[in-house]
Each structure stands twice: as structure tokens, then as C-alpha cells.
């Protein structure tokens, strides 16, 4: 199902904002793959880079604070803390993880591009995103959508095809999780 805010008449270009964490990139790619099943779209991954890398820890706190009253001025402040991102030709922004949230919200507001964010809000309101996918309900805003299975780049059909070559043996599966979305 195509979200209502997307114009699908032409090929859609999706920008993935990445914090460099492989699991977060895989979740964003999973969203893009789901959209590719519904419409003609391509995606590009852009890894975020702080202008003042040595100040990133206090700046993360600062930009989350700015998101509590996000407007064009504060969004430009947030965007200005990162190395430039060319977003003009993109129709949608997708990002996963807490390190991308503030910039995703800011870029979406400044450039009026719909955005999808995956992950727990960490104090940033769901209303700043066109779609905010979380593992549990954090916000009463309609953009906060709860899902049972985290999107990822490995589709069920790909896994089914791979299982054909699988030879059953005795295996043990160990799953380790944290307090994030994955």
C-alpha cells in the first residue's frame, strides 16, 4: 500500500540517511524494497557526517532539544551542523536509528520532503515525520505506526529461495537484542 503523501506518477527517488550502523541501513533498505514492490523507485544511501565531529555527543542532546520546537530556523541550525546533503531531487527521505532522527525531521521540514523514520523517538515527537515506525506505541499522533516485524532488506521471498539450498542439520540460534527497534 502506497502512503497517501507520495506522488507515484513518476519514478520516485528515495534518500536514505545513514548513521553508518549496518542494522539501521538494512532497515531503511527494507522500507525501500517494500515501496519498490508497489511503485517504480530507486534509492541512494547518504552517510551523515558532523561538521564538528569532536562535539557530536553534546550536539546530539542539543539537536534533540531543538526538535521540541522545530521550525524553519531551528531546522536550519540542525542541518547546518552536518556536512551538506543534496536533497533537491528526492521525493522521500527514509532513516533509521536515533542518530538520524533530528536531521531527518529538519531536512523534511526545510525542503518539504515526506519522511519516514524507524526507531524509538528518544524525545522527538512523531508529528515531525510523515511516518514514524516504532515497535510500540509512543505517541498518539497518527504518523506513529506500530509494527510487529522490523523491516529489513531480506524479503520473505528471498529467504524462501535461499532455504531451497539449505540442508537441515543440528543448529542453535542465539538472538541478542537491545532496547532499540531491532
Kindly label every feature range from the protein language model.
Residues 1-9:
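N-terminal amphipathic/basic-hydrophobic helices that include classical n-h-c signal peptides
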Residues 10-15:
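Extreme N-terminal starter segment of soluble prokaryotic enzymes
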Residues 17, 21-37, 42-146:
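Active-site and donor-binding regions of nucleotide-sugar-utilizing enzymes
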Residues 121, 126-182:
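A nucleotide-sugar donor-handling region in carbohydrate enzymes
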Residues 6-7, 45, 156, 173:
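Intrinsically disordered, low-complexity regions enriched in small/polar residues
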